[in-house]
Amino acid sequence: MGKIRKLDDALANKIAAGEVVERPASVVKELVENAIDAHSTIIEVELEEAGLAKIRVVDNGDGFEEEDCFLAFERHATSKIKDEADLFRIRTLGFRGEALPSIASVSHLELKTSTGEGPGTWLVLKGGELVQHGRTSSRKGTDITVSHLFFNTPARLKYMKTIHTELGHVVDVINRLALAHPHISFRLTHNGKQLFYTNGNGDVRQVLAAIYGLDVAKKMIAIHAETLDFTIDGYVALPEVTRASRNYMTTIVNGRYIKNYSLYKAIEEGYHTLLPIGRHPITFLNIMMDPLLIDVNVHPAKLEVRFSKETELNELVQQTIRQSFQKKTLIPEVTAPRVEKTKAEQQTFSFEHIVKESNTMSPRVTEIHRDQEKKTEERIVLEKSDEHVRDQDVTLLDVESVVPSEHVTGEMDQERIPPLYPIGQMHGTYILAQNENGLYIIDQHAAQERIKYEYFREKLATVTNELQPLLIPLTLTYSSSEYLLIESYRDQLAACGVFLEPFGHNSFIVRSHPQWFPKGEEVAIIEEMIKQVLEMKKVDMKQLREKAAIMMSCKQSIKANQFLRNDEIFALLESLRKTSDPFTCPHGRPIIIHFSTYELEKMFKRVM
């Protein structure tokens, strides 16, 4: 007797459910995506016990015809594709015909639906088996209730996390779908309490404010790019707004939320040297492309996709984000504790530059007196959580209030930071400077690190024949495997100024180096660059030069607790203003922080 047998439908559906229905959030995702495909404009999701007890999804979409209701719970039954060619031009979120039978097989499911052209249809299924059916109201749309989830698969139920964790996954799903479809009104309630709401007016900025809070939304800037193959729209947060994980990076492709590691890397490369190590940005990208360029039929959950022009897309994303920051002032603002009302009038304020005398010739600064009249008004402060959505209705927000404020991201015609006039130094580490806009605090090490980094980056990209012989040639010995690896990348190292000659068994000798190598650090730099090659295994010239420039700039920059003369401070600030990115060091730490005059006056209660 043969050993191979065909599985019955109930068991096959449970196996399929293991891939499609991982947790309550998976059920919500599949049902809401079906509602979106049905052209719904209002979608409401109700949960009890994070969906483990009950999930209800109500929409005003097209609804089901009566005969379609029964067929919808058969495996691989779908209205969204008809033949093999349709797989290459998928424009809907669902297409596999697995969601409803998979969900029904591991739960109790009740369906009420109508096309609005007569009485609707009512079905009840338990474990995928039809137990009741009849008529219901003619309200157009669909109402699906899923209860007793995983009642017949206790092993899956055993691995569910806490209510709080499972609820967080559901909120995450709704957040991303709301961003992908801002023209749809979403409402999410849990145990009778509203957690999230959007009005469906099509304004992505209001959805961002509902998810991340008004403060974060104000610090996100719009981006746009278009080529023959791709159109990119979205919002990216300023580099000062970061998170510890990539969970806050949302990428939508043709209306579908996806996860793609190479796209994440491209986004972060767009923030090159603007992010601190180990931190990630908050971003929302909406990418449109021809369906022929994307394969979504990779996994039943449809989160993983493949692109046929992945390199071109990554380069466009990287370039678009990088260009969005090139004309922006990225100086973090320090804000005082918020107050609900401010005085209608304010005294005029003047400032003067205080220049310390030094033993050396210091540039003289003309004292400037400028009167500023501040016109303030009553402000209504909407407190929004950065991580979770409160109960406030975001539709109450003025659309313009979500646009990044000009003082945070103002565009500069000539210079990315204004002229700064030094006041002095604090603890031999921070430079204090001022201008008519307030007080600036500059990290002197980070500032010079940025200056040196851009200098060394340019030098490393230029081939030079101006070499300086080493007084005592440097001999380097490695293991056999390391020697072979270094030998294979000698040309790349030479392009960066490290000239290696084989010298005996598993050894190299270095006789000279470029003249621009920092004096006294030549040997350390050569050894460090070879170490980077050994760590990288596969050497990329751009990455090698980048790491070398960062390493050199860090070693050569002034350190903390190093006191500077006035002329040195002036020179440092002027050099910083001439850099291409004067806001962060190569490691992504901020260089300069701004206290506006208004914020200082709030701190000292001069403005109440």
Curated annotation (Swiss-Prot):
Where does this protein come from, organism-wise? Anoxybacillus flavithermus (strain DSM 21510 / WK1)
| Biological process per Gene Ontology, one example term | mismatch repair
Q: Name one GO cellular component term.
A: mismatch repair complex
Which cysteine residues pair off into disulfide bonds? Answer: none
Under the heading NCBIfam families, the entry gives: mutl (TIGR00585), PRK00095.1-3 (NF000950)
Family membership, please give it. Belongs to the DNA mismatch repair MutL/HexB family.
Task: List, in alphabetical order, the Gene Ontology terms for molecular function in this entry.
Answer: ATP binding; ATP hydrolysis activity; ATP-dependent DNA damage sensor activity; mismatched DNA binding
Output the lineage of the source organism.
Answer: Bacteria, Bacillati, Bacillota, Bacilli, Bacillales
Highest taxon in the source lineage: Bacteria
State the protein's name: DNA mismatch repair protein MutL
| InterPro entries cross-referenced by the UniProt entry | DNA_mismatch_repair_CS, DNA_mismatch_repair_MutL, DNA_mismatch_S5_2-like, HATPase_C_sf, MutL/Mlh/PMS, MutL/Mlh/Pms-like, MutL_C, MutL_C_dimsub
Q: Which UniProt keywords apply?
A: DNA damage, DNA repair
The function of this protein is: This protein is involved in the repair of mismatches in DNA. It is required for dam-dependent methyl-directed DNA mismatch repair. May act as a 'molecular matchmaker', a protein that promotes the formation of a stable complex between two or more DNA-binding proteins in an ATP-dependent manner without itself being part of a final effector complex.
